[in-house]
């Protein structure tokens, strides 16, 4: 995908955003810093939605956007949409399915689902023509075995008719005919090879990146429908795709903190054989990604310290640095500073 296009979609005309953070958020690079900026930018639900899909050319992408006057950029590659950039963003949004679907592609491996489904469609299509001599699409071994098992279990039960009916019903419900065309042009079957994003883009008069995003969002929409139908014959294709909201290690640290109130964070770190700084990072991760009602802020954040920080906090929390805050509050540590910011952002969310 073209990173410059992606940056336009997830930038703002009212908030300077770190271009590197936007990219790291979308590919799901799980650090407390990236999670915090996702919360700050309102992109937490999109975290990891484009995992493995973006190139590593931030400098070139920002330069391109700046030269075309779509963004303003500073020396740290923070970007702000110009009026021209906002207009272009609006046009991009109008050309795509609903972007709220990204929240689902963040929670599930939609790219993996699309590969499974494409192989399943190819196999069933060839089966319907009694053709055993073809080259199946290459996907991961475990996924290939899953599809093979699924096909063997269901092929005798009018599978071609069922699959055709399901896909036809899905395509008929799409808001635009062009979305249905993009989806089907990507599929392979009997005497039919799926087109590349570039080929589909030429036919549709759209960029390959817009085609890629459209496909991702359409596969996401289909996946959400299948997840709501546990009795569907295609339900096995959705297995093992869910992504955890919180990392396993952070969840373990947070669980110990909640279940054993007598243990200090230092003691928890000792029992878990991790560094104290790592334990703090785990608790910050939990505070960011879990619902506010699940976080015992009253135990984590000293009330008197919270009052001091509340008295001096600026209107824009994103522009408030630890260095500035620590000059105003004696013995302030970064953990409490960041925790305070997280709580404030969640309260105003």
Show where each model-derived region lies.
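Short, amphipathic alpha-helical "recognition" segments used to contact nucleic acids or chromatin
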Residues: 3-14, 180-194, 247-262, 305-316
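Short amphipathic alpha-helical interaction segments
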Residues: 51-67, 207-216, 277-282, 332-335
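Accessory beta->alpha helical hairpin/"wing" motif in late/C-terminal subdomains of nucleic-acid enzymes
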Residues: 72-112
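Short Lys/Arg-enriched helix C-cap and helix-to-coil transition segments
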Residues: 222-239, 290-306, 349
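Short, amphipathic alpha-helical interface elements at domain boundaries
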Residues: 1-54, 142-158
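Short alpha-helical "recognition helix" segments of helix-turn-helix
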Residues: 22, 199-202, 268-270, 321-327
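A short, conserved structural fragment
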Residues: 63-76, 224-225, 288, 292-293, ...
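Exposed, interaction-prone assembly regions rather than primary DNA-binding/catalytic cores
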Residues: 97-173
């Amino acid at each position: 995908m073209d990173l410059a296009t992606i940056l336009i979609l997830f930038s703002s005309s009212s908030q300077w955003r770190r271009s590197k953070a936007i990219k790291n958020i979308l590919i799901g690079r799980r650090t407390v810093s990236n999670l915090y900026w996702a919360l700050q930018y309102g992109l937490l639900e999109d975290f990891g939605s484009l995992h493995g899909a973006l190139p590593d050319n931030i400098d070139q992408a920002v330069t391109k956007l700046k030269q075309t006057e779509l963004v303003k950029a500073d020396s740290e590659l923070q970007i702000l949409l110009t009026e021209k950039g906002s207009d272009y963003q609006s046009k991009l949004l109008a050309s795509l399915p609903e972007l709220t679907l990204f929240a689902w592609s963040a929670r599930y491996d939609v790219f993996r689902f699309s590969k499974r489904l494409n192989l399943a469609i190819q196999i069933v299509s060839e089966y319907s023509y009694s053709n055993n001599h073809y080259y199946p699409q290459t996907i991961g071994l475990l996924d290939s075995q899953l599809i093979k098992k699924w096909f063997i279990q269901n092929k005798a039960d009018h599978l071609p008719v069922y699959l055709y009916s399901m896909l036809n019903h899905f395509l008929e419900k799409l808001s635009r005919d062009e979305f249905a065309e993009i989806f089907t042009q990507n599929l392979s079957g009997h005497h039919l090879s799926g087109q590349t994003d570039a080929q589909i883009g030429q036919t549709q008069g759209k960029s390959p990146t817009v085609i890629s995003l459209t496909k991702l969002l359409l596969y996401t929409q289909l996946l959400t429908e299948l997840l709501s139908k546990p009795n569907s014959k295609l339900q096995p294709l959705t297995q093992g795709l869910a992504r955890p909201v919180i990392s396993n290690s952070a969840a373990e640290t947070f669980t110990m903190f909640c279940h054993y109130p007598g243990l200090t964070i230092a003691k928890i770190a000792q029992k878990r054989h991790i560094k104290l700084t790592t334990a703090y990072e785990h608790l910050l991760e939990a505070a960011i990604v879990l619902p506010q009602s699940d976080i015992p802020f009253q135990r984590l954040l000293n009330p008197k310290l919270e009052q001091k920080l509340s008295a001096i906090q600026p209107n824009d929390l994103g522009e408030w640095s630890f260095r500035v805050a620590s000059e105003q509050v004696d013995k302030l540590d970064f953990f409490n500073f960041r925790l305070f910011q997280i709580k404030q952002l969640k309260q105003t969310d």
